[in-house]
Amino acid sequence: MYEICYISIPLYNTSTYAFADDDQKAEMLKLAQAAADSVNAAGGETVSDQVSALHEAAQNTLPDIYAVLDGETSDDSASVQTELLTESDVASAFTQDGAADALRSLSYGEAAAVQINSHTLLLMVRVDPLSVSSLDDLRSQILSDMKGGELDDALAAGGAELAHDLDSSAINRLPAKKIVNNSANS
């Protein structure tokens, strides 16, 4: 389970929708990584400090990042979002080579710039999920992550073992001609 605070940076001009070429992506990633380095240098002790440092770094760097594609930032470009990601979320969203591993390698409070797919770059800081939510709030997610697959397998195996006997007296009480499909009558 990964809790991240992030700012999403599109790898395209938001006015013309012209995508960045490889050189432009590299330049944008370099600028975003410099912002992540400044967040790490700030060394925030609390999540609030880390989010403030991320927001400040984004406000200072986003105009330069957007300028690579001749774009302009909007009022909400530096808005920090928070997301709790499961391992399956990471696998499905972080599709760029090495992106998922980059997230997994971050320690709590560490910031990085990661290109997660062909059109999005994240400036993010990983935070401790228990510093944002209580254990009770996270309990179902933790259990699902830890034992969800085993539970699915156990339910499937138990279902496969059930006897498939039809109760003839129940069938005689309710013959098929008495069953009315309400959705077909409306």
Tell me what each language-model feature is.
Residues 38-96, 137:
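Peptidyl-prolyl cis-trans isomerase
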Residues 1-38, 89-186:
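PPIase-associated folding chaperone regions across multiple families
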